């Protein structure tokens, strides 16, 4: 599971990147904590995954997580700071 704590004033598109392939997980609205369930087989390839948050509008900057190895049952938290 990915938990996105969006403290910014911008809605963010959330992506998982693995083996060069980017998969959109969904939208993380501003000032809300959003959870995304990641199903087995949803991300291509193996190894590490990086999560990215990209603003829909505005001046917010894109945020990326550190590369992470996901195992079933893991929860990763992505913090998006206020502007």
Descriptions of predicted regions:
Residues 59-83:
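Extracellular beta-sheet/turn segments enriched in Thr/Pro/Gly and aliphatic residues
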